[in-house]
Amino acid sequence: MKYSIIIPVYNRPEEVNELLQSLTKQTYRDMEVIIVEDGSTVTCESVVRNYAGKLQLRYYTKENSGPGMTRNFGAEHSQGDFLIILDSDCVLPEGFLQAIEDELMRKDCDAWGGPDRAHDGFSSVQKAINYSMTSFLTTGGIRGGKKQMDKKFYPRSFN
């Protein structure tokens, strides 16, 4: 297994549906998807069941402990060579995993990430907030467009 995609979830079944749909459109398929429900009162279990035949999925539930501990839980249950940690509101563009695979074949690295991009359905206010959170003037550094911190860390490419 090349990639373990870990998704911590708290009361977000609609977002998980959109994320899983984007994962079904990936051309690179050597991945497992690990969804960890972090004490949700509104679970995504039925959404996950809808994708059982389309993706290699594992679904876990646990008591609420926050996103960090939930990501760690997913990592402990992963089998992939690389961990990709996504929030439930992410939607991956087609070719995301293939682009990662191509880059890792070209040049080794220890970690990578990607800037946030506003969803087309966001309101003007949501888009303005997104811009302010990812603008070079407000965040600088990696999120602001720095090309490389050192030899083994690459800036956020897209998320």
Where are these regions (language model features)?
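A structural helix-start
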Residues: 9-17, 37, 41, 93-94
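Acidic donor-binding segment of Leloir-type glycosyltransferases
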Residues: 20-61
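The conserved acidic donor/metal-binding loop of glycosyltransferases
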Residues: 87-91
